[in-house]
Amino acid sequence: MEFKEGLTFDDVLLVPKYSDITSRSQTNLSTKLSRNISINIPFVSANMDTVTESSMAVAMARAGGIGIIHRFLTIEEQANEVLKVKRSGSVMIENPYSISSEKSIKDALDYAEDKEISGLLVVDSNSKLVGIVTERDLLFANSNGSISDIMTKDVVTAKPGVALDEAKQILHQHRIEKLPIVDDSGIIKGLITSKDITNNADFPNASKDKKGSPLVGAAVGVKGDFLERTESLLEAGTDVLVVDIAHGHSENAISAIKNIKKAFPDCELIAGNIATAQGTEDLIKAGVDAVKVGVGSGSICITRVITGSGVPQLTAVMDCAKIGNDYGIPIISDGGTRTSGDATKALASGASSVMVGSMLGGTDESPGTVLTKNGKRFKVYRGMASLAASIGRKSKETGSFSFDDDLNDYVAEGVEAMVPYKGTVVDILKQLSG
């Protein structure tokens, strides 16, 4: 058996050297997330069910990074989370939500609540714009009434191609918050809102796609419905997919990568997790656009304890980055990042970006409710190979969970914990970015 030295973040320090930078404002943190996607800060929120859904992904994109929506949702739910992110920051919303004028007020209330929006465009049987209903219209209205009775019928609109400055002028002139974009035949082509214009100005460093919408990623598995899930996520506007499996250097992962790339050759694909140079090369040859590195290094991951397998994270990143550089494929360091210094070391050792989980768990934007214990506030944070996460997945997939049957077949490689409530993720990202 051959033994080699392996280093983790705590084993090294960066040697200070001369710098000609006189202000932090002179630094540029932009980097490659994958072969064809760049982000403005090198941070990615982990695809974990206690870290990233739409709220976290929106915050990450606004700060200049990107969030990866976890896959432990139904296909429809996960695609809807992607849509929420895409609609949160686009100057013009394509395919805005609309409802038939024949529907009831209750239908409108239920639809608006489900989509988490404050207003709806109203269309006739020919899909032409006939009105608009807002929160104020729906407030205290008789739920049995018709939308056509309460909607605003004289709707101010603009033509496709309207300039942003002109749209702002129209919104101000008419004291309205929503401006439907309608063609000559009355068909809706988009929607501009005052909130989206404000967000666009407030977050100049935001990570955006070519259409100006926030960047967002989503995870898929390697078995079952992964191709169907991939198709739905891409249709929803997902910018990058992450093939998510604990041991990425495996036949299951490589087969899934090849199948996804064959069915969707233009999709941007990240895969992992791996921890060796050979694993990196095999995934790259299978067709990935970035490789996620880290086995057992996460704060709530016990893979190394249970399986005796893993590579210290700094060494793993260095080994994998050498291969990534040869092929021009970015490396994402995933795991072991407990401080901003750890992130710096990961980048210095060859990673293009850093996936963070534990640092973001417990924030306002992470899924879950705030719990109070002994006068202190906490949120749940768990590894995706933990028993609790497995129970949650099994229950979603089958609608039930048998403690006698299912527990006998499962070996946990992660744990669940309560982490202190941390407030908004914005402050953490500022600390990470310096």
Regions found by a protein language model. Give the residues of each.
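Alpha/beta catalytic cores of nucleotide-metabolism and tRNA/nucleoside-modifying enzymes
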Residues: 1-18, 22-25, 100, 159, ...
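Bateman/CBS regulatory modules and CBS-like beta-alpha motifs in cytosolic regions of diverse proteins
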Residues: 23-40, 46-48, 77-115, 122-124, ...
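Active-site-adjacent beta->alpha loops and helix N-cap segments on the catalytic face
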Residues: 25, 74-83, 187-207, 225-228, ...
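Short beta-strand/loop segments at the ligand-binding rim of alpha/beta enzyme cores
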Residues: 38-44, 91-96, 209-219, 260-275, ...
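Generic hydrophobic/aromatic pocket-lining and core-packing "Φ" positions
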Residues: 54-57, 108-109, 147, 167-168, ...
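Catalytic cores of alpha/beta
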Residues: 55-58, 228-236, 275-293, 333, ...
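Glycine-rich phosphate-binding active-site loops on the catalytic face of alpha/beta enzymes
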Residues: 62-77, 184, 238-250, 289-307, ...
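Catalytic beta/alpha-barrel core
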Residues: 69-72, 98-99, 119-121, 157-159, ...
